[in-house]
């Protein structure tokens, strides 16, 4: 690549190669594998590896957009380190990244051979003194909702269960739980966009309640399907029995009648 880009810090602004993510949100301290296939994304990976640079990972709003413009991407993402790159084919690479810190883009150049972002570190505002009582109640609600989700989804890994049940740090839980439990990427991004810890706790409670309700609905649907299948199988079995009985000839050749006199 002949394009020259200088990664620098200017007035707390970082200039980094960026990768637009489809249906994926990476949080700080999140270690994640994903595949990169678009030319601009591969070019960003190659440049970052060659120059030992971090990258800015940002989700695009429309997953179908092949070449999204700046306005088609969210404001907040994560500055990440590329830990590993594996070439899958000529036009596909698989990378392992580790999220470092949350950042907000101030500019995004989409015209070059790869996306180039100007970003500012965006730490989440901690809980204020007057918010502590609400935060404590919300955190308790998060733990209760997690237990409810766990009871309906036993496939949650033991590592996730241990991390959530053994930790009471709201800042950690507000990033760890969305990264590992929430299904919809829009829900993950909503947490990423929220800049206050109390706001993140409120969002997390709301999203976990919805996740629990969705699991309840899934269970109800599965039960109804099972009941319908059982009924259909019983009806089919009875129908086949009646059909066989109606078709079976009755022989009186060797029938012995009882003596009555």
Regions inferred by a protein language model and the residue ranges of each:
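N-terminal low-complexity, acidic/polar interaction/targeting segments
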Residues: 1-255
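A short, hydrophobic C-terminal helix/tail in secreted or cell-surface proteins
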Residues: 256-261
């Amino acid at each position: 690549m002949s394009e020259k880009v200088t990664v620098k810090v200017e007035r707390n602004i970082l200039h980094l190669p960026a990768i637009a993510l489809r249906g994926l949100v990476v949080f700080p301290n999140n270690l994640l594998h994903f595949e990169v296939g678009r030319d601009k994304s591969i070019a960003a990976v190659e440049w970052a590896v060659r120059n030992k640079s971090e990258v800015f990972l940002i989700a695009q709003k429309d997953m179908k957009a092949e070449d999204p413009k700046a306005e088609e991407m969210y404001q907040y993402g994560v500055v990440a380190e590329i830990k590993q790159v594996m070439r899958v084919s000529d036009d596909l690479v698989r990378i392992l990244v580790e999220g470092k810190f949350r950042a907000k883009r101030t500019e995004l150049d989409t015209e070059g051979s790869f996306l180039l972002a100007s970003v500012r570190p965006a730490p989440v505002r901690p809980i204020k003194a007057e918010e502590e009582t609400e935060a404590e109640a919300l955190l308790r609600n998060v733990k209760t909702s997690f237990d409810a989700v766990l009871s309906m989804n036993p496939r949650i890994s033991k590592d996730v269960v241990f991390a959530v049940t053994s930790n009471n740090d709201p800042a950690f839980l507000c990033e760890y739980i969305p990264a590992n439990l929430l299904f919809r990427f829009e829900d993950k991004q909503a947490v990423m966009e929220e800049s206050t810890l109390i706001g993140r706790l409120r969002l997390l409670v709301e999203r976990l309640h919805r996740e629990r309700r969705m699991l309840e609905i899934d269970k109800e649907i599965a039960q109804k399907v099972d009941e319908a299948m059982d009924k259909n199988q019983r009806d089919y079995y009875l129908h086949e029995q009646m059909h066989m009985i109606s078709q079976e000839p009755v022989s009186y050749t060797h029938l012995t009648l009882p003596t009555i006199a």
